[in-house]
UniProtKB/Swiss-Prot annotation:
Responsible for the release of ribosomes from messenger RNA at the termination of protein biosynthesis. May increase the efficiency of translation by recycling ribosomes from one round of translation to another. SUPFAM superfamilies: Ribosome recycling factor, RRF. Belongs to the RRF family. It is found in: Cytoplasm. This is Ribosome-recycling factor. Coiled coil: none annotated. The gene is frr. GO terms for molecular function: ribosomal large subunit binding. It comes from Clostridium botulinum (strain Eklund 17B / Type B). GO terms for cellular component: cytoplasm. InterPro entries: Ribosome_recyc_fac, Ribosome_recyc_fac_dom, RRF_sf.
Amino acid sequence: MIKDIIKNAEEKMQKTVTVLKSELGTMKAGRANPSMLDKIQIDYYGSMCPLSQAANISSPEPRVLMITPWEKQLLKEIEKAILKSDLGLNPSNDGSIIRLVIPELTEETRKDLVKKVKKTGEESKVAIRSIRRDANDKIKALKKDGDLSEDQVKKGEDDVQKKTDAIIKDIDKIIVDKEKEILAI
């Protein structure tokens, strides 16, 4: 029973880390990265779909993204979606592909991005702690039902805490790595 609770909590914690990595991947760090466009949705014949499912996205140069749509008539729609996004990029449409030049980050922009990264990391840590609390509450509920002894509850809570500490350490490393990437000139 405790093992199931701990396993479930660990899976939720890993999902939180995966979401954090994906969110940080969409933040521009002065270098072109196709994952920056992951959140962009386009109107594909009446239904919204991710840009990556309607076009090939590549990075031929360190600061350039090239978007080649599967169908040429999507160029205008892709351009519109990029302009509406919060990325602050200006697409250049040449009739068959769209180029996005990623501007150099100013010192102020870098500092703002680092703040965003720290905030996102802190939100992930709060989510992890919430998962820990839920797992501990479930373990304590088993004790109230008479299914567990005090020692089993203590061991279960210790195991949950160890998993929590390991995941928070991973999150801290991810945040530090992203900060270094942003601040690298």
